[in-house]
């Protein structure tokens, strides 16, 4: 209950509509009255910009919309922590940026601690306030997004400068 989870593949129930998917944690973890649950669901869908799709089925949604539904479900419990596993997996670059912006905005608005597991360097730089770099299960580096570009750790540099744009910056 302390942790809201955004799964890599969104993990929506195909047999439930958007509203039911978002409400699911409330149904299994709380004894909140139904009216209150629906108000929370609508509020969370509004926060992620999907307040008009609560009756749609997951099969009717784009990948970005599914991620937003997953985010709404992850925050519906007012959790202290939000854990995002590869939130940009399977998204086009523009949608990935929008999801990063949304995660950062919600982290600040809801005053939650957000942990993001990612291999997307854009996400690291854009939403990473405090970054920990793990390689083969070991912590090799930690710091902020300004210092990550100035490190001399070979494995981290290979990750940071793995795409052509970042190589040009270096």
Residue ranges and their predicted role:
Residues 34-52:
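Conserved ABC ATPase "signature" region
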Residues 57-61, 65:
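Conserved ABC ATPase signature
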Residues 76-80:
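A short, proline-enriched helix->beta-strand linker immediately N-terminal to the Walker B motif
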Residues 82-85:
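Catalytic Walker B motif of ABC-type/P-loop ATPase nucleotide-binding domains
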Residues 93-95:
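Helix N-cap at the start of a conserved alpha-helix in ABC-type nucleotide-binding domains
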Residues 146-170:
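C-terminal boundary and immediately downstream tail of ABC-type ATPase nucleotide-binding domains
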């Amino acid at each position: 209950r302390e942790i809201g989870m955004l799964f890599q593949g969104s993990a929506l129930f195909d047999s439930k509509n958007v509203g039911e998917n978002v409400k699911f944690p409330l149904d299994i973890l709380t004894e909140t009255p139904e009216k209150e649950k629906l108000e929370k669901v609508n509020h969370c869908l509004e926060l992620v910009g999907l307040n008009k799709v609560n009756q749609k089925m997951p099969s009717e949604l784009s990948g970005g919309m599914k991620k937003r539904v997953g985010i709404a479900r992850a925050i519906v419990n007012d959790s202290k922590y939000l854990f995002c596993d590869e939130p940009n997996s399977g998204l086009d670059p523009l949608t990935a940026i929008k999801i990063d912006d949304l995660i950062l905005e919600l982290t600040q608005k809801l005053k939650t601690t957000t942990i993001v597991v990612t291999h997307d360097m854009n996400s690291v730089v854009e939403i990473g306030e405090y970054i920990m770099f793990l390689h083969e299960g070991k912590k090799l580096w930690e710091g902020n997004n300004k210092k990550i570009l100035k490190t001399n750790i070979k494995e981290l540099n290979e990750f940071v400068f793995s795409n052509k744009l970042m190589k040009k910056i270096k």
